[in-house]
């Protein structure tokens, strides 16, 4: 078994790079409506029947088997939680062992195993933390001074000197110190690349991506990382900076991370994406040949879509529910996690490295100090989202609120935290963000076509009617709308219309991206600042413990999009998928439109 090289380069930084379950979806043989033999296909606004077939029954059986496994696993898991004395028993004293709740439990560090980089464990990396039998329960400390995170592109010289001193001190700690840069980077590796089995469900690994755990896990990860840095320079007011990639002034990588003699530098970054190059929030592995203004327009429209029009509900913003015993398949990410979070990881990572290290792979992302500035802005998006009104509020499900993680704090003590400990950062965690302008808030995508010219033209040969299908070229399908009528304003507020792309199957150790367009011309697709662009599916390479392919879903809110396109009365929509990046086949299981409250 090959082992990935240890991150010895983390100690040096002077070298420079040369340059909940779904209902039925489309059956195997879809009841799609195709126009005859003309050169182009003009969308017919007729009703399309999508009836369940054996394929869907199989999907339901798989879901039922997973639920049965979870129910059986509960007894085993609760026996473990009750019976273990030492390490894990110490972490579960306040649990209600017979309650019918299934939050993800914190990992048992004694069961940690090498993290996977390639399918089936052919290549691994050691990411396990030091083990201790003493675990504290997190309690907010209101005596901590309030810390304000600055925008990285406008920090003062005084702040930068302090930040560099703290980062250098963290790098200088022994590798086996849980507060060291080496160990802090391993935190992300262990939780994201299959190092921790779920307690009571040892065949299922803990995965903090593609679900509602994404935001709270990374918030608490950054919290303890920041507290360690502050302790190392004896400054409790120190706060990490955020990379303001949601605004044109912050689109380039902040200059403070590009000095090759600085402890903030990482040598494994894409040499073609150094300042003053603007970040591409829709990047998937290949650079687009667009001018600077187009990049700005597209980035701002993407932010509006991911924060406003496409993220009206907690379900869309946070992602799929993830409970104890759930498999790491069939989930879907929230809007910001999927895009631009994933895109930025890939954009920064070094394509000349085997696994796109450092930022381009979850196992190595934490080795780059820029990772923490990136995630500080991701966290900032959570704060901002909750101020935008409507249903944009935190999840109230106790399986989310009581999900738990383990982190080492600034005193090298292991701490157990719950998601509910992270919901009010200023009050519970004593930090906030320096306010800056939000230009994306006023950059709503506009329709490419006028409302009286919305019929899309698609070559007949590009229409696909059988699913599952392999996505190897531009593919268009007609999908029925259950409510083919213009809904009232209240109805739109009460229920968001969703396009669901189900059972997206691919090799999870590779980067994947495809774009989604609605009612657009397949032979001449819109720019990403147009309403016809519905979004993207983006995957950052990550390890796994089996050779099975990764399977997930994508949910896109399309209420505003259909309104912009004048398609609210249409009985169906044309959905076009455009593969952008993948070194192995992508399989699409089916499509459906449904409504979510």
From Swiss-Prot:
Keyword Nucleotidyltransferase attached: no
Biased composition (Low complexity): 54-63
Gene3D superfamilies reported for this sequence: Di-copper center containing domain from catechol oxidase
Thermal behaviour (record text): Optimum temperature is 45 degrees Celsius with catechol as substrate. Completely inactivated after heating at 70 degrees Celsius for 10 min.
Cofactor details (free text): Binds 2 copper ions per subunit.
Transit peptide extent on chain: 1-49, 50-101
Disulfide-bonded cysteines: 112-128, 127-189
Species name: Prunus armeniaca (Apricot)
Reaction catalyzed: 2 catechol + O2 = 2 1,2-benzoquinone + 2 H2O
Tissue occurrence: Expressed in immature-green fruit.
SUPFAM superfamilies xref list: Di-copper centre-containing domain
Lineage: superkingdom: Eukaryota
GO cellular component: chloroplast thylakoid lumen
Molecular function (Gene Ontology), one example: catechol oxidase activity
Chain positions covered by the region annotation Disordered: 49-70
Protein name as it appears in the record: Polyphenol oxidase latent form, chloroplastic
Known EC number: 1.10.3.1
Lineage: Eukaryota, Viridiplantae, Streptophyta, Embryophyta, Tracheophyta
Subunit annotation: Monomer.
UniProt keyword list: Chloroplast, Copper, Disulfide bond, Metal-binding, Oxidoreductase, Plastid, Thioether bond, Thylakoid, Transit peptide
Swiss-Prot/TrEMBL site (Cleavage) positions: 429-430
Main location: plastid
């Amino acid at each position: 078994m090959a082992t990935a090289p240890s991150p010895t380069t983390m100690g040096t930084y002077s070298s420079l790079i040369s340059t909940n379950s779904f209902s039925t979806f489309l059956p195997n043989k879809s009841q799609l409506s195709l126009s005859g033999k003309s050169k182009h296909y003009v969308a017919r606004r007729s009703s399309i029947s999508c009836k369940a077939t054996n394929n869907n029954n199989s999907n339901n059986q798989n879901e039922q088997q997973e639920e049965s496994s979870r129910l059986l696993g509960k007894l085993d898991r609760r026996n473990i939680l009750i019976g273990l004395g030492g390490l894990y028993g110490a972490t579960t004293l306040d649990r209600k062992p017979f309650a019918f709740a299934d939050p993800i439990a914190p990992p048992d560090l004694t069961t940690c195993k090498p993290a996977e980089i390639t399918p089936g464990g052919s290549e691994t990396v050691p990411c396990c933390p030091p083990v201790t039998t003493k675990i504290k329960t997190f309690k907010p400390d209101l005596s901590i001074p309030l810390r304000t995170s600055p925008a990285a592109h406008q920090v003062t010289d005084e702040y930068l000197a302090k930040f560099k001193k703290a980062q250098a001190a963290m790098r200088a700690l022994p590798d086996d110190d849980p507060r060291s840069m080496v160990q802090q980077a391993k935190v992300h590796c262990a939780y994201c690349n299959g190092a921790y089995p779920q307690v009571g469900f040892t065949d299922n690994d803990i995965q903090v991506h593609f679900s509602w755990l994404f935001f709270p896990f990374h918030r608490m990860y950054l919290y303890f990382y920041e507290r360690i840095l502050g302790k190392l320079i004896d400054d409790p007011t120190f706060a990490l900076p955020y990379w303001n990639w949601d605004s044109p002034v912050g689109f380039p990588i902040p200059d403070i991370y590009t000095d090759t003699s600085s402890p903030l530098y990482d040598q494994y970054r894409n040499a073609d994406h150094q300042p003053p190059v603007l970040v591409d929030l829709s990047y998937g592995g290949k650079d687009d040949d667009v001018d600077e203004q187009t990049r700005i327009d597209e980035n701002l429209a993407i932010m509006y879509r991911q924060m406003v029009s496409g993220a009206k509900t907690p379900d869309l913003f946070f992602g799929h529910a993830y409970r104890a015993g759930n498999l790491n398949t069939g989930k879907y990410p929230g809007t910001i996690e999927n895009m631009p979070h994933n895109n930025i990881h890939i954009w920064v990572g070094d394509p000349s490295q085997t696994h796109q290290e450092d930022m381009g792979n979850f196992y190595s992302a934490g080795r780059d100090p820029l990772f923490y500035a990136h995630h500080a802005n991701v966290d900032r998006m959570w704060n901002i989202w909750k101020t935008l009104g409507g249903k944009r509020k935190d999840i109230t499900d106790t399986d989310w609120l009581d999900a738990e993680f383990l982190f080492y704090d600034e005193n090298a003590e292991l701490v157990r935290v719950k998601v509910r400990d992270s919901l009010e950062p200023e009050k519970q965690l004593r930090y906030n963000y320096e306010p800056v302008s939000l230009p994306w808030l006023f950059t709503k995508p506009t329709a490419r076509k006028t409302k009286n010219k919305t019929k899309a033209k698609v070559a007949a040969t590009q229409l696909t009617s059988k699913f599952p299908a392999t996505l190897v070229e531009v593919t268009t399908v007609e999908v029925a709308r259950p409510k083919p009528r213009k809904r009232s304003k209240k109805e739109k507020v009460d229920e968001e219309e969703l396009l669901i792309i189900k059972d997206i199957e691919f090799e999870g150790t590779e980067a994947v991206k495809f774009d989604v367009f609605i009612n657009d011309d397949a032979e001449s697709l819109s720019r990403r600042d147009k309403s016809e662009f519905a979004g993207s599916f983006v995957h950052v390479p990550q390890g796994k413990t089996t050779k099975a392919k990764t399977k997930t879903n994508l949910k896109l809110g399309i209420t505003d999009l259909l309104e912009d396109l004048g398609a609210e009365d249409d009985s169906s929509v044309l959905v076009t998928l455009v593969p952008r990046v993948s070194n192995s086949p992508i399989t699409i299981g089916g499509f459906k439109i449904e409504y979510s409250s």
